[in-house]
């Protein structure tokens, strides 16, 4: 890795503003691609440390970028035209240089890097950028298609030049070109939805897949054809362990070299001389989806009352042990696009007034009701996710004090997904980079129910208009005004209850010296799984 190395802070130190949107992926990428194992570590010394086993919570549905895998530049199997360095700045990857922008932002021209081969030994060509055409094809099952809405056409030239023509100027388009490029000579001969490429990928990245035991592990080794600096780690395994407690037990037993853990479990390793705990800030936030179709969750007064009743700071202090920040919206408080002044402390009195004025009156057991309808709904969280479980229980406790009953249930995603239209979910969301990347898919009414986009089925014409303005304008002042309006609208008309922005805690065997950041930067991708992928088809995150 040629980017500047920035040490991840020990949890006991002052944390750096490192932003990563998928904890396990960033952790694995940093440990494998950028760390140098020392000879004084565990049994076996340097030789043993050249391979590593990382515990992750879940696995991807696919390893194909055509269906959303690694779409935010986080993959270790693939590369995009551009990549991000540790400071979030764009840098050339498969492109030889940053693009040339002409025609008032409507024409974007790239020149490919020479001498790049795929892991099967075949050379990269401009024709391989067909990736974009396939993603945009409505027959391709990729719910991230809206992220490339600005693209009118893509053309490839024999001299290695790739030209994108846009429908309208799209200020953050260059950042979209971190999308991984796949080989047309392999993937182009298959059905993108069902072909073998989904489980047998061929890419240009530093690693190649060696095996995938569904539900158990994914194995990787260094790509001998890789065009960049060779990774220090020759092979690694992503061990899929959904339950946080089991993952911690496996780490303690030595079965894992590292893992992403919630604060309460990471704290149990702080005095372990053989391991280090690292902390990194992120864009990840926890929020409760409040579906518009729900009889209770769709009521605006209920939504506003819940927003007023929740004690965000207590969640940061008690659930995250201080490793996070209150979330007053989808953007973290230290983001340059964040709208200062929308902060709001817990106010149970205000919650009561809102419900009284809307006709929700106290009833049996202190739970409010209106026209025979109790203010009660179910809140799902994925079983085994300790952080989300704790958030859900705290949320239910806060809601009850306002007279709203929240019934918390843990379940598998097979159970949760069919219920998302009408039942609340403790969601794990977040987006690094331009605000368009996360806000559009989170809030635009045209994406309601599209996979894991707009899970609340939120619909606000003024917000839609502002989202479109922010996406289509290149004027920084116009864009800033649009995103200010959106954040204020979410206070007056919430579709989600935003709870916390979390810091990621990583526990790693001490023999890994020089751990560095490796940005993963996904937008609304799924719970982290695999080296830079999304856990669910289409770049969706729950």
Curated annotation (Swiss-Prot):
Any Pfam family matching the protein: SBP_bac_5
Region called Disordered, residue ranges: 519-542
InterPro entries (alphabetical): Peptide/Ni-bd, SBP_5, SBP_5_CS, SBP_5_dom
Entry's localization field: Cell membrane
Gene Ontology MF terms in the entry: peptide transmembrane transporter activity
Membrane topology: Lipid-anchor
Gene3D superfamilies xref list: Dipeptide-binding Protein, Domain 1, Dipeptide-binding Protein, Domain 3, Periplasmic binding protein-like II
Predominant location: membrane
Lipidation (N-palmitoyl cysteine): 34
Signal sequence annotation: 1-33
GO biological-process terms attached to the record: peptide transport
Keywords assigned by UniProt, alphabetized: Cell membrane, Lipoprotein, Membrane, Palmitate, Signal, Transport
Lipidation (S-diacylglycerol cysteine): 34
Source organism, top-level taxon: Bacteria
One annotated Gene Ontology cellular component of this protein: periplasmic space
Segments crossing the lipid bilayer: none
Family the UniProt entry places it in: Belongs to the bacterial solute-binding protein 5 family.
Task of the protein: Required for transport of an unidentified substrate.
Protein name as annotated: Protein XP55
